[in-house]
Amino acid sequence: MIDNRDTESSKNNHGISWNTRRNHAAWKLYLRDVEEDIPVYAVPALQTDYSGLPPAYTFVGDREVFNCETLKYIENLKAAGVPAQVDVYPTGLHAFDMLMPFRKISKEAIKKFEEAYVYAVEHYHT
């Protein structure tokens, strides 16, 4: 959850594990009654300056509720000069790697995530 505003992939999404209805409910619970001056720590997509943030790796399914906001977040990091990478998996819904770990795309996503973690520990951890 990066953006509390609807994106193209989050509106009218009927995914089985996470969807528009669940997303709206989660944001409502999380933000409570805060509607103005929402801290960027609560909603990272509201950030305007991404410089100085740590490198990032993530993956997302192309049918994922968070697809658009994830891609935009990585794009913003890169534009600020932050090393960032995202892998997009076809047919992937929210949490596909955990719900269907036996699928080829899940195994690939898990493997690449583990590789990115090891790389981060070796190159960025002090």
For the regions a protein language model found, what residue spans apply to each?
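Alpha/beta-hydrolase superfamily serine-hydrolase fold, recognizing
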Residues: M1-T126
